[in-house]
């Protein structure tokens, strides 16, 4: 096959017009300007740098002037890190303080120092006889729920939470691995197909100081029933102060979803936000932004039929809707807690495909669209929020890069 490819490429040189193509191809590339400019803002928001025509420039907003800085810096290629295979989870997690490594091995959870010394088991009943397994999820979690982690350290590195699954009664599925190697391998997994019961799932938490294990009450004292809430547990994290463990819980139909918080000292859990859309389905992991004040978070919900943003307290109290649109909000761009404002993209153009930048107060007041609704926009906001770079285009209008102020006024074009 490789020989055929080489011969085909050699024949190209003998085609009519090949020499003319070689001569004009570089000219064509240089004659077309892309129209898109990607910038790096300075921390004070008063200037930014960018690369254009093979040179690096610095633009001063006050002077509206670009100064050439010379050749652009070399692009630093970061080595590609380890990623779990499709449908799988990371097999280990290092503690935030760097002193511990948690990992799963032979269906049990272990702790050790980062160099592997001081190994100790924190579970011992994970085996093929009782079909328990810890620190790893089933295929559906990675494949359909995007869950690529199975263990989660508290911010102070004193606790580690992790999955527990029981695979009793589940039918076995045979997977052939390493098919590109000299010798392949076989993995047997418990995999419920359509109509088969799902596997019981629980969440455990281990305290490194007290050496005590706690199981979270993820189903309000009820056993796993493969249908009600608690069928799937996913989207885990800790609160910034480490006092509660957060997770999403949904039923098999996925038309009810609860965002819940668990007490790692008692195992008790509570509902923070509940979403229900019985006519269809709820989004598995709605967009969320935790605020730096440690008391509030922003939550996206389609409860009105349109995706909007809501401000919540951690106790589950709705403070206020931030947006109340009859069009879809798309994503949060920036939250300025000091000024109490949020910038976000929304489908509020003259058709829903054209993304627009909005600014709104966190109390839901003074929602303002800052961009031209006849165009589609991609923005990069300055750190001080006073300006933004705006790449504007439509399906039949070439992209242009603009400098816009916080009132929506165009200041310059690049």
Ranges and model annotations:
Residues 49-54, 60, 101-107, 113, ...:
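Beta-strand C-termini and the immediately following turn/loop, strongest in propeller blades
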Residues 61-64, 114-117, 208-211, 264-267, ...:
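Short loop/turn segments that connect beta-strands within beta-propeller blades
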Residues 36-40, 45-47, 51-56, 66-76, ...:
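Non-catalytic accessory segments flanking enzyme active sites
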Residues 32-39, 86-91, 135-155, 229-238, ...:
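Signature of short aromatic-glycine-proline-rich micro-motifs recurring in repeat-based ectodomains
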Residues 12-18, 64-78, 82, 122-151, ...:
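Predominantly five- to eight-bladed beta-propeller fold
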Residues 82-129, 223-226, 235:
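A conserved hydrophobic secondary-structure block that centers on an alpha-helix together
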């Amino acid at each position: 096959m490789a020989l055929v490819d080489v011969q085909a490429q050699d024949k190209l040189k003998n085609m009519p017009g090949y020499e003319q193509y070689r001569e004009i191809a570089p000219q064509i590339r240089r004659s077309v300007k892309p129209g898109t400019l990607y910038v790096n803002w300075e921390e004070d928001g008063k200037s930014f740098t960018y690369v254009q025509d093979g040179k690096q420039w610095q633009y001063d907003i006050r002077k509206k002037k670009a100064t050439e800085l010379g050749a652009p810096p070399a692009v630093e290629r970061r080595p590609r890190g380890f990623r779990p295979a499709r449908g799988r989870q990371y097999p280990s997690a290092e503690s935030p303080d760097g002193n511990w490594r948690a990992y799963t091995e032979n269906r049990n959870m272990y702790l050790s120092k980062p160099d592997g010394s001081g190994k100790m088991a924190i579970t011992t009943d994970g085996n093929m006889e009782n079909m328990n397994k810890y620190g790893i999820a089933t295929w559906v979690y990675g494949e359909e729920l995007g869950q690529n982690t199975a263990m989660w350290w508290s911010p102070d590195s004193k606790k580690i939470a992790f999955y527990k699954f029981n695979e009793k009664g589940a039918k076995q599925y045979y997977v052939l691995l390493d098919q590109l190697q000299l010798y392949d391998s076989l993995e047997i997994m418990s995999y419920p197909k359509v109509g088969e019961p799902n596997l019981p799932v629980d969440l455990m938490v281990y305290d490194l100081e007290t050496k005590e294990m706690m199981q979270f009450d993820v189903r309000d004292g009820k056993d796993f029933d493969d249908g009600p809430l608690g069928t799937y547990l996913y989207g885990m994290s800790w609160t910034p102060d480490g006092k509660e463990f957060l997770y999403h819980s949904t039923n098999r139909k996925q038309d009810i979803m609860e965002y819940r918080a668990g007490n790692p000292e008692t195992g008790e859990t509570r509902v923070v936000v509940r979403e229900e859309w019985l006519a269809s389905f709820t989004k598995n992991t709605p967009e969320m932004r935790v605020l730096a004040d440690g008391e509030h978070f922003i939550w996206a919900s389609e409860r009105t039929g349109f995706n909007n943003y809501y401000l919540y307290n951690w106790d589950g109290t709705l403070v206020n809707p931030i947006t109340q649109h009859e069009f879809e909000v798309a994503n949060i761009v920036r939250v300025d807690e000091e000024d109490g404002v949020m910038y976000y993209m929304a489908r509020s153009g003259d058709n829903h495909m054209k993304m627009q930048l909005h600014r709104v107060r966190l109390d839901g007041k003074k929602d303002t669209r800052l961009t031209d609704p006849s165009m589609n926009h991609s923005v990069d906001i300055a750190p001080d929020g006073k300006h933004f770079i705006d790449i504007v285009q439509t399906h039949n209008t070439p992209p242009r890069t603009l400098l816009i102020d916080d009132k929506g006024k165009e200041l310059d074009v690049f």
